[in-house]
UniProtKB/Swiss-Prot annotation:
Protein's pathway: Nucleotide-sugar biosynthesis; UDP-4-deoxy-4-formamido-beta-L-arabinose biosynthesis; UDP-4-deoxy-4-formamido-beta-L-arabinose from UDP-alpha-D-glucuronate: step 1/3; Nucleotide-sugar biosynthesis; UDP-4-deoxy-4-formamido-beta-L-arabinose biosynthesis; UDP-4-deoxy-4-formamido-beta-L-arabinose from UDP-alpha-D-glucuronate: step 3/3; Bacterial outer membrane biogenesis; lipopolysaccharide biosynthesis
Encoding gene (name): arnA
CDD domains: Arna_FMT_C, Arna_like_SDR_e, FMT_core_ArnA_N
Pfam families listed in its UniProt record: Epimerase, Formyl_trans_C, Formyl_trans_N
Name the UniProt record assigns to this protein: Bifunctional polymyxin resistance protein ArnA
Site (Raises pKa of active site His): D140
Keywords: Antibiotic resistance, Lipid A biosynthesis, Lipid biosynthesis, Lipid metabolism, Lipopolysaccharide biosynthesis, Multifunctional enzyme, NAD, Oxidoreductase, Transferase
Length: 660
């Protein structure tokens, strides 16, 4: 049976050996070039392929049409992936009549995503395993073909568990590959309600936070022990690595991070104490704990910290242009909840942010970005992270004021992008789900979906193409001039403070605010073209949490990434949104203050928006990049969002002249 294999690491090597032993004909192997910054303790797939006289390739992008065509020419009957680090596109899966299968290092559906070996140890699991599953477009989500369980012993560290998993994988493949070859397999669908997903880990993720329980810190040490980069902490500005540890149920009133004793080297934690058994100062040699204490100059009562002392004091400065807007004011609230951000904001109004104006770490100037260019340039230079959130983003304005949309959304933002390039500042840019346009994919994917818009004589697309061109400019600056960036695409975020009822009165608001105004005023809810268009509605709290994680950028995982932020489970038509909103309105305690419901009215889009409008039938995001980069998934049900949004707006209405 002819196969093409995607493989890396020890699992890749043993997978190839298992295929050959089972009588498969391997036409080609795709692997990766080794990362010079990574400690290579594992077998080389490239070397094995060369020894077995099998063609081997390591393209930067195996999903490029040229590589897809070359794989098609190999006519594989089945495809296998063994720890290949990049997602493989659906077009490649479809080349093999028998399908594609992936070996994953966990008991799926638990621990989908990256680094499951390390994550199960970080989380203190007592069992994991290996899974062979059918590959589908969503990573690690296909039907399970076979699994083997692996017990995790209390003294297991990453390398010992790795060896256990390799042994289990070898057994699993020996049992399963002949059955796949003969088409004799039983597949079991994964239980989505049990799925968990974890993202990529980097060395910077392994710092020891001493306020946590000693057992949690010990698990971190186990998860990244040699040959992984190791868990680390600081004495002042001196970094040291902890290679092995023990948990002590030491009852101490010492502050977390305090040295309780130096022989043994015992550190107070949020609960209990951690003994550092072996460790290493800087790039030095490994030594036992008491010698390490001497090397670091530690005495009883010394304090350790999770980051260098020189960097622990300075807050990250975040510049938010459009801070009074829907995203801007909610993001400000989230940032100020932490103690390590300084927020600088500019907007033409301050009604939504009035609650922050006296906060010591919030600095606001009222102004227009098209006028206050000097202030903006100075603050781009001064701040660490820039979020240009100013844009006209209401559909009726795209046809009513297309030139103004272009001038503000494109020209003004391009100037800010160039400031970020000039001063080498990180930019987090709000693209839009509108860039996908009339894409026909079931799930809109950041890396593979085509961006399809209508003809030039439909000005409705000026917002979409303005944003898309800015996305491409930012990407090019990142590639050519090293701009540090992340693009995020909100999918129909909604919640309190989304526009306002006055904006809705002139038609310049998003859908839910317009519908609430209709209920408040007793006017018919207008369903444009019947309201059958489907959207995926995302609670503002879910969206802001994802955006906050982009700003945090743990391990720089978000650099150069395009990330959809939406809730694919909250899909509803505009008509369904209206019906859910009406039901919530009818049972609201303030309902008796408002006129009777005036019904639904179907309106043609050309009458409502103008002749230059086109609509999109569906818009559902793939959120695999959000899973991978942010360890994020939305949690809030659409009905809860509707209830809270409605309640917020109803309580802003002056009820003195309403019927009771």
């Amino acid at each position: 049976m002819k196969t093409v294999v995607f493989a890396y690491h020890d699992m890749g090597c043993l997978g190839i050996e298992a295929l050959l032993a089972a009588g498969y004909e391997i036409s080609a192997i795709f692997t990766h070039t080794d990362n010079p910054g990574e400690k290579a303790f594992y077998g080389s797939v490239a070397h094995l392929a060369a020894e077995r006289d099998i063609p081997v390739y390591a393209p930067d992008n195996v999903n490029h049409p040229l590589w897809v065509e070359r794989i098609a020419q190999l006519s594989p009957e089945v495809i296998f992936s063994f720890y290949y680090r990049h997602l493989i596109c659906d077009e490649i899966f479809q080349l093999a009549p028998a399908g594609a299968f992936n070996l994953h290092g966990s008991l799926l559906p638990k621990y989908r995503g990256r680094a499951p070996l390390n994550w199960v140890l970080v989380n203190g699991e007592t069992e994991t395993g290996v899974t062979l599953h059918r590959m589908v477009k969503r990573a690690d989500a296909g039907a399970i073909v076979a699994q083997l369980r692996v017990a995790i012993a209390p003294d297991d560290i990453a390398i010992t568990l790795h060896h256990k998993l390799c042994h289990a994988a070898r057994q699993l493949l020996e049992q399963t590959l002949p059955a796949i070859k003969h088409g004799n397999i039983l597949e079991i669908a994964q239980r989505e309600n049990e799925a968990t997903c974890f993202g990529r880990r980097t060395p910077d993720d392994s710092f020891l936070e001493w306020h946590k329980p000693a057992s949690v810190l010990h698990n971190m040490v186990r998860a990244v022990a040699d040959p992984w980069p190791g868990a680390f902490s600081y004495v002042g500005n001196q970094k040291f690595t902890v290679w092995s540890s023990r948990v002590h149920p030491h009852a101490s009133k010492a502050q977390p991070g305090s040295v309780i004793s130096v022989a043994p080297l015992l550190i107070a934690c949020g609960d209990g104490a951690l003994e550092i058994v072996t460790g290493q100062a800087g790039d030095g040699i490994t030594m036992q704990g008491s010698q390490l204490a001497q090397m670091l100059g530690l005495v009883q009562g010394s304090r350790l910290n999770s980051q260098p002392a020189c960097t622990a004091r300075r807050r990250t400065r975040v510049l938010i242009l459009g801070v009074n807007g829907f995203i801007g004011n909610h993001l400000t609230e989230r940032l100020l909840r932490e103690d390590h951000y300084e927020v600088y904001g500019l907007d033409i109004g301050s009604d939504a942010i009035s609650r922050f104006l006296n906060h010591p770490h919030f600095h606001f100037v009222e102004g227009d970005i098209s006028i206050h260019s000097e202030w903006i340039e100075y603050h781009v230079k001064k701040c660490d992270v820039v979020l240009p959130l100013v844009a006209i983003a209401t559909p009726i304005e795209y046809t009513r004021n297309p030139l103004r949309v272009f001038e503000l959304d494109f020209e003004e933002n391009l100037r800010i992008i160039r400031y970020c390039v000039k001063y080498r500042k990180r930019i987090i840019f709000p693209s839009t789900s509108e860039v996908y346009g009339m894409c026909s994919d079931k799930y809109f994917d950041e890396d593979h979906s085509n961006l399809i818009v209508g003809p030039v004589n439909k000005p409705r697309w000026i917002y979409s193409v303005s944003k898309q061109l800015l996305d491409r400019v930012i990407w090019a600056y990142g590639e050519k001039e090293g701009l540090q960036f992340t693009l995020f695409l909100p999918f129909n975020w909604m919640g309190p403070r989304l526009d306002n009822l006055n904006a809705a009165r002139i038609g310049s608001s998003r859908a839910i605010t317009q519908l609430i105004l209709n209920l408040v005023e007793g006017s018919p809810i207008k369903l444009i073209d019947g309201g059958k268009q489907k959207r995926c509605f995302t609670d503002i709290r879910d969206g802001i949490e994802a955006l906050y994680r982009i700003i945090e950028n743990a391990g720089n995982r978000c650099d150069g990434e395009i990330i959809n932020i939406g809730n694919p489970e909250n899909e509803a038509s505009i008509e369904e949104l209206g019906e859910m909103l009406l039901a919530s309105f009818e049972k609201h305690p303030l309902r008796h203050h408002f006129p009777p419901f005036a019904g639904f009215r179907v309106v043609e889009s050309s009458c409502y928006y103008g002749k230059g409008y086109q609509d999109v039938e569906h818009r559902k995001p793939s959120i695999r990049n959000a899973h991978r980069c942010l360890d994020w998934e939305p949690k809030i049900d659409m009905q809860e969002t509707i209830d809270e949004t409605l309640d917020f707006f109803l309580r802003t209405v002056d009820l003195t002249d309403k019927p009771s």
